[in-house]
């Protein structure tokens, strides 16, 4: 009781000379010293003594970077600070807990790639021993004793230069620090996605203050739940001063979807930017997006991330199963040499490499093969009018290129891709999902396509050699349906995305009326806006045949029919190349 009375007396004594206006001034100067930003409190400030000294303030703001569009980096409807008594007597503010409601955080980057969240961190005392630097509470920094952060009803907006604003809502978030450990429980919402991150890690506060100045070891034991599916994150991070961070992380899940994560990872990972990034002015006119990929969020580090997901959700198709790989990080290079997963009843394997990702033009290469599956096995059954039956499929790819965006990458790419599809039946709506280019091709070769509900496919092969962003198709794309043999030739410029594709369909009977309407057609325009044009060479050839038919009383037409019957076209066999030339066996 005596100790309690003494503590209460000390609290009363400390509070007896605390003037809210003076405390506001002290807090403002402390924030300015710690962050380089101005703190303003325009609402009422109140003080309570028990169970600890607590200051509650309303309508608070912290200033933004000078170049930012919003004058405030942070605003709060209300903030409550639990303050340590004894440091206060000597003129220092040490905060054990911060409770926040109605938080608005405005994150933004400028044209130089700088983020407005780059606050000036307090420097650790040079005289502190390394093993004490991350745990000492006597450095004189304002928030060094912060143990708990509770946030309610928060809204975080992020805007990259020349991009639309992205918004994350935090209904609640709590981060507690005790005995060198952090307890984390965060609920977040982004677009149609809900996220919860829960678990324990090394002290976030200690890691922040000691990073790059003292040795840091941070263990991770977290559960990320995304739209009801959970991913276990375990491992450790080791950072020594003047050296690159090292880490070993494991990601394990019974079932997880990566599609929602892609939408929120860019925003959530933005706080991990270490400095200026390469700017890129995107153009929205391309089929392959010209928006910059978030290479600047990849860590410059040495380490590995081992991924083991039993069922991986993939957009618009059945999930992959037994998805496994290990990402190896080495400076600004990432390699995945053991990528494997099951697709349908088949298997896929491959390798991926990203290098020089801190440069203006990262290099990317990927190769692999998927086989022993069918389109029927991977097409979801959500739409009864877009079904597929059969269609055994094999795919191989070996492509390398460079660039900051998908468009830059394909415009500089070289390599080859091959797809082979066997006998099957394709609903019209399934074909329509192939996009404008596929629909344009089918319309061109079969004017009755729109009136039919299903296409009977005997085979289809597409071999696409790529050299410096140019796809040259020389009878290397072929289709065979129950009625037609179809061969495509021409080119695709992946830089301009211009199309120059000639279509050569013939009746499987080998008979012709003398006028090959398909031979008169070509696909022009761009991948984003394909159009049907006129094949001038086909027009000339057809005109000659028609003219000769009139002159010879139909003998030239009969000759064409005889020639067609004698030389049967085999589009798939002609188009197919050796699989080992694309993805050598044994890889």
Which residues make up each language-model segment?
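Amphipathic hydrophobic-ligand
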Residues: 36-40, 66-83, 95, 162-175, ...
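Secondary-structure transition motifs
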Residues: 37, 58-173, 245-300, 424-452
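Elongated, acidic membrane-bridging lipid-handling scaffolds
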Residues: 124-217, 283-329, 457, 466-468
């Amino acid at each position: 009781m005596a100790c309690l009375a003494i503590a209460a007396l000390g609290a009363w004594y400390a509070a007896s000379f605390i003037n809210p206006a003076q405390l506001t001034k002290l807090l403002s100067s402390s924030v300015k010293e710690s962050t380089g930003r101005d703190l303003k409190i325009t609402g009422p400030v109140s003080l309570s003594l028990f169970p600890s000294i607590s200051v509650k303030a309303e309508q608070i703001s912290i200033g933004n970077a000078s170049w930012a569009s919003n004058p405030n980096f942070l605003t709060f409807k209300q903030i409550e600070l639990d303050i340590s008594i004894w440091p206060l007597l000597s003129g220092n503010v040490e905060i054990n807990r911060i409770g926040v409601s109605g938080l608005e955080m405005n994150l933004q980057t400028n044209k130089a790639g700088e983020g407005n969240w780059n606050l000036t961190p307090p420097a650790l005392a040079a005289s502190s021993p390394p093993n004490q630097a991350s745990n000492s509470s006597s450095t004189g920094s304002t928030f060094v004793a912060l143990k708990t952060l509770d946030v309610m009803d928060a809204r975080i907006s992020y805007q990259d230069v020349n991009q639309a604003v992205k918004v994350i809502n935090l209904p609640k978030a709590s981060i507690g620090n005790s005995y060198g450990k952090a307890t984390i429980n965060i609920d977040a919402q982004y677009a149609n996605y809900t996220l919860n991150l829960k678990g324990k890690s090394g002290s976030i506060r200690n890691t922040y203050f000691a990073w790059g100045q003292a040795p840091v070891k941070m263990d991770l034991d977290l559960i990320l739940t995304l739209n009801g599916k959970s991913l276990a994150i375990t491992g450790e991070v080791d950072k020594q001063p003047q050296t690159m961070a090292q880490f070993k992380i494991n990601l394990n899940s019974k079932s997880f979807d990566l599609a929602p994560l892609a939408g929120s990872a860019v925003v959530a990972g933005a706080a991990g930017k270490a400095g200026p990034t390469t700017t890129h002015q995107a153009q929205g006119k391309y089929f392959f997006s010209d928006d910059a990929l978030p290479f600047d969020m990849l860590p410059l580090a040495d380490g590995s991330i081992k991924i083991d997901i039993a069922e991986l959700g993939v957009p618009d198709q059945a999930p992959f199963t037994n998805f496994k790989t290990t990402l190896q990080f080495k400076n600004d290079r990432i390699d995945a040499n053991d990528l494997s997963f099951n697709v349908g009843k088949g298997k896929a394997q491959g390798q991926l490499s990203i290098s020089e990702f801190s440069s203006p033009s990262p290099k990317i290469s990927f190769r692999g093969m998927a086989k022993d599956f069918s389109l029927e096995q991977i097409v979801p059954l959500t739409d009864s009018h877009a079904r597929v039956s059969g269609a055994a499929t094999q795919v191989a790819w070996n492509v390398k290129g460079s660039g900051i965006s998908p468009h830059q990458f394909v415009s500089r790419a070289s390599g080859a891709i091959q797809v082979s599809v066997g006998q099957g039946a394709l609903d019209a709506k399934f074909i329509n999902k192939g996009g404008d280019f596929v629909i344009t091709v089918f319309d061109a070769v079969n004017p009755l396509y729109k009136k039919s509900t299903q296409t009977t496919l005997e085979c289809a092969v597409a071999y696409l050699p790529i050299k410096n962003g140019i796809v040259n198709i020389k009878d290397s794309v072929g289709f065979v349906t129950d009625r037609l043999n179809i061969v495509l030739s021409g080119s695709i410029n992946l830089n301009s995305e211009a199309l120059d594709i000639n279509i050569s369909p013939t009746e499987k009977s080998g008979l012709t009326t003398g006028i090959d309407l398909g031979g008169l057609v070509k696909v022009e325009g761009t991948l984003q806006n394909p159009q049907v044009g006129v094949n001038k060479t086909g027009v000339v050839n057809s005109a000659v045949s028609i003219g000769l038919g009139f002159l010879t009383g139909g003998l030239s037409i009969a000759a064409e029919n005889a020639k067609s019957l004698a030389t049967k076209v085999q589009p798939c066999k002609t188009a197919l190349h050796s699989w080992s030339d694309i993805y050598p066996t044994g890889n």
